[in-house]
Amino acid sequence: MADYLTVTHLTKYLKLKFDRDPYLERVYLTGQVSNFRKRPTHQYFSLKDESAVIQATMWAGVYKKLGFDLEEGMKINVIGRVQLYEPSGSYSIVIEKAEPDGIGALALQFEQLKKKLTAEGYFEQKHKQPLPQFVSKIGVITSPSGAVIRDIITTVSRRFPGVEILLFPTKVQGDGAAQEVVANIRRANQREDLDLLIVGRGGGSIEDLWAFNEEIVVQAIFESQLPVISSVGHETDTTLADFVADRRAATPTAAAELATPITKTDLMSWIVERQNRSYQACLRRIKQRQEWVDKLSQSVIFRQPERLYDAYLQKIDRLSMTLMNTMKDRLSSAKENKVQLDHALANSQLQTKIERYQDRVATAKRLLMANMASQYDSQLARFEKAQDALLSLDASRIIARGYAMIEKNQALVASVSQITKGDQLTIKMRDGQLDVEVKDVKNENI
């Protein structure tokens, strides 16, 4: 009679076979991801091809180290071990390592992170800072032993001697490189003497350049208050640091040129040109002023200053005559009124009427005299004010204060440009005049 096995016994036997079979302990498998839904810890999904499906498990630590995200329909190559799950009698593969089929894991991770950061706006042009035209100190984050720092120093020294280079020695590949780049970007931003940053390294494989594709480096460059120039790898290499930086340079030399857009020679030429323009503008202004002074010195006021107050004297004479005539007319009118009043009073029999008329005459006389005195004082004050203003322009009074007046051929001399050697001049002073001959002429500004 045959012995019948229980389901449990059969399952345990099969599990023992699975666990001890060397071919199932390390399986290399390719398949398409199916039924994938990202979980916060371990990942459970299926791998399938055209004819079969196998369940797959990936522990949280393994998934975290992948460097890329699994997606529904993605074809991957995995390494793992096959195990049997006794309660259900089903088998599955526990994945220990995985990479995309046909494309490197880093390349896929690059594209996925680029897509994510683009959607979050990290690479938008509106976040780019303009580079300064003139710098005094440049921070460089790179390896101290590479050709990058040498090329930058050489180019900056050639284009603008005197600009300082501050090197932040940084590990640029391998474990911890991304963290060092981030730390030095933040250190540089704490300084107040830097104008911009150059972040870069020489060429290499995608693995060598990977520190500059890390999200923490992209975040640090994005948050930098200093403008950042990225110069990572060769011209054909592209990193996420290039996308987020304010400017990307294909080579260290190009980065140094971007950092010094205007050379010292260009600046000196511009300064000389501005100086020449300012000098010519000053000469034109001086010439215009000299022409104005020459023209003014030939005007009637300076050649015949007495004509300046002729009109005022005539006006004063007219006002004086008017005042005198007015006073005479009013006195004459007052006398006539007095005669009429005296005649009327002589014919009056009433003493009270005489006294009333006498009071009116006295009042009228007082008002007349007060009015005449007020007008006389007002006209006299205006006359004296005008006379003082005119006398202040009198050349003889200017000479009396200690100045001298120079004449050539009875014409006033206002500038040395009117005099030549050998000219006969007359110098008028307050107590006499001098007749002199010019022996030399010197042009000097006072």
From Swiss-Prot:
Protein task: Bidirectionally degrades single-stranded DNA into large acid-insoluble oligonucleotides, which are then degraded further into small acid-soluble oligonucleotides.
Keywords associated with the record: Cytoplasm, Exonuclease, Hydrolase, Nuclease
Protein name (record): Exodeoxyribonuclease 7 large subunit
Single GO cellular component term: cytoplasm
Entry's transmembrane regions: none
Entry EC no(s): 3.1.11.6
Catalytic activity reported: Exonucleolytic cleavage in either 5'- to 3'- or 3'- to 5'-direction to yield nucleoside 5'-phosphates
Record-level GO BP terms: DNA catabolic process
NCBIfam families: xseA (TIGR00237)
Subcellular localization: Cytoplasm
Gene that encodes it: xseA
GO molecular function, one term: nucleic acid binding
KW Disulfide bond (keyword) present: no
Species name: Streptococcus pyogenes serotype M1
Quaternary structure note: Heterooligomer composed of large and small subunits.
Family, as annotated: Belongs to the XseA family.
